[in-house]
């Protein structure tokens, strides 16, 4: 039977509960335990797939096709495990399941209520998810006191009775703010947040205090006194130069040891963090840097392309260079000098997205990178716009476009997938999850991967139109990767260009700090060569 670590948050959102959960997972896994992590989001959406990236950040897609909160990306990167649909729980998913069961008569005419039906459904999912784990870490989204989160908090309170108090740890992430006027840290918000938790019957074992200034022992003792925890259970976490430093900070303060003791697990020895030491050391002490232009539709929201940026950092660590990301709003390029906006960059990356806004700016950036020999990497929509740009400006297909942006295009080089034609619902209906792809020998893609059979994650409705494949290939574009069994073009590249590759998939979702994605690693290698005056490969 699994033991459980529940991570809640108080005072304000965005304190780093996901990073805390991932860091705890890292420390426990490095001690040899089987660990998994679940995110429980209190919103009524069934999943994150239809949510606005400006509000919610990126959608993280799992191998099994679940569209989830970006925190699952943190979890996968920190514990280096492949997660799935069962690792993402939302209010919408729970209520949909319970209402469906009620309609089928599963409750035998009983009155269906939040307690016990909703809370039991939540608990049953946690128990199932923990069946093959030593420790299941569960992050509850939002903050204590939010009305939406009450059923989840009640469910995790009841879990202590269900599995035994000795098998449960409650870790509360809270804020200790610095008041500039008073020139001091304030503990009252943390006290009130813990009081709110205690009001519903949850007594936290550990407090993770986010603060911008050092906390002295007197302050930790004060928090411990008013919140009824040992002073050593008051953990200070300040902003780090890289999120991959957080496990070291938590370990130095004994967080992993306290969790193991509370759960009755062996806590002798030290976690093997040698690979993480190498990552952080190479990140912090990189002697050189490259600059990559990220030309996207949602760059104003720092989390909209979170996995892309992390994958670039991973590739930089692999090569021992810092990667500086220049965020370029594609819509602004439509009325700006593209050359001036991209001046001095060592590579251009065009990420995914949806809709017509900013598309011509993307196409302008693609043309500039192609003509100037700048390493160019397109992901999903980025790959599609690379095809559009090449069709227009090299193959003389005037008006070539994607049916998504121009349904009446004379040359729809990107078109709606056949199986999408009769779909009238938006959520969960795209081509989602991992699919196999065969690579052509002797291509850039094959060299990057080092194998001819790969699997990557997808999230799209539109695809390369094979009616134009012969003409585009005759014009010099090369198809180097095709989905096995259905002839769907997955990768295009341009022989003779320093580095030019577009993939229909989202390789960034599988990148790890200790194991960068092959395409990102080779892309940054090409950027380094350009920086130092060499060719891209």
PLM regions: where:
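Short beta-alpha connecting loops at secondary-structure transitions
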Residues: 55-63, 240-244, 350, 371-377, ...
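Acidic/polar loop patches that form or flank catalytic/metal-binding clefts of enzymes
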Residues: 206, 268-271, 377-378, 388, ...
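Flexible phosphate-sensing "switch/lid" loops adjacent to ATP/NTP-binding sites
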Residues: 1-324, 330-347, 354-355, 362-368, ...
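Active-site proximal loops enriched in glycine and acidic residues that flank catalytic Cys/His/Asp
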Residues: 9, 39, 211, 238, ...
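Cysteine-nucleophile active-site neighborhood
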Residues: 15-18, 22-26, 30, 341-436, ...
């Amino acid at each position: 039977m699994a033991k459980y670590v529940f991570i809640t948050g108080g005072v304000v959102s965005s304190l780093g509960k996901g990073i805390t959960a991932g860091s705890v997972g890292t420390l426990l896994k490095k001690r040899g335990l089987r660990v998994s992590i679940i995110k429980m989001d209190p919103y009524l959406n069934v999943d994150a797939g239809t949510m606005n990236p400006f509000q919610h950040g990126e959608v993280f897609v799992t191998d099994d096709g679940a569209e989830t909160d970006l925190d699952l990306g943190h979890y996968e990167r920190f514990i280096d495990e492949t997660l799935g649909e069962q690792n993402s729980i939302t209010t919408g998913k729970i209520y949909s399941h319970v209402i469906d069961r009620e309609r089928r008569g599963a409750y035998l005419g009983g009155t269906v209520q939040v307690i016990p039906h909703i809370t039991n459904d939540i608990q049953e999912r946690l128990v199932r998810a923990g069946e093959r784990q030593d420790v299941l870490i569960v992050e509850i989204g939002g903050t204590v006191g939010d009305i939406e989160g009450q059923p989840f908090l009640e469910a995790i309170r009841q879990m202590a009775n269900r599995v035994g108090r000795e098998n449960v740890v409650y870790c509360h992430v809270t804020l200790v703010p610095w008041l500039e006027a008073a020139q001091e840290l304030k503990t009252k918000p943390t006290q009130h947040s813990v009081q709110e938790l205690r009001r519903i019957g949850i007594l936290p074992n550990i407090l993770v205090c986010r603060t911008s200034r050092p906390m002295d022992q007197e302050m930790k003792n004060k928090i411990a006194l008013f919140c009824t925890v040992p002073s050593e259970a008051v953990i200070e976490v300040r902003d780090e130069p890289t999120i991959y430093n957080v496990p070291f900070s938590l370990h130095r303060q004994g967080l992993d040891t306290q969790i193991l003791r509370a759960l009755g697990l062996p806590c002798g020895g030290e976690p093997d963090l040698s690979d993480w030491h190498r990552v952080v050391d190479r990140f912090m002490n990189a002697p050189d840097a490259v600059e990559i232009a990220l030309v996207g539709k949602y760059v104003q929201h720092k989390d909209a392309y979170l996995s892309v940026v992390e994958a670039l950092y991973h590739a930089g660590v692999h090569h021992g260079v810092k990667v500086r990301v220049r965020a370029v709003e594609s819509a602004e390029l439509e009325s700006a000098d593209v050359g001036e906006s991209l001046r001095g960059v060592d590579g251009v990356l065009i990420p995914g997205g949806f809709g017509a806004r900013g598309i011509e700016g993307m196409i302008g950036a693609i043309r500039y990178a192609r003509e100037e020999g700048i390493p160019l990497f397109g992901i999903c929509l980025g790959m599609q716009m690379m095809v559009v740009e090449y069709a227009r400006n090299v193959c003389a297909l005037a008006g070539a476009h994607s049916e998504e942006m121009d349904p009446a295009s004379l040359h729809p080089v990107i078109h709606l997938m056949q199986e999408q034609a009769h779909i009238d619902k938006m959520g969960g209906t795209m081509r989602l999850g991992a699919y196999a792809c065969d690579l052509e020998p002797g291509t850039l893609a094959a060299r990057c991967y080092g194998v001819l059979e790969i699997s990557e994650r997808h999230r799209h409705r539109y695809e390369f139109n094979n009616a134009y494949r012969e003409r585009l290939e005759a014009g010099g574009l090369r198809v180097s990767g095709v989905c096995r069994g259905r002839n769907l073009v997955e990768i295009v590249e341009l022989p003779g260009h320093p580095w030019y590759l577009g993939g229909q998939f989202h390789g960034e979702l599988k990148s790890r700090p200790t194991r960068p994605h092959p395409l990102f690693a080779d892309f940054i290698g090409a950027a380094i060569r350009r920086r130092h005056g060499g060719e891209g490969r």
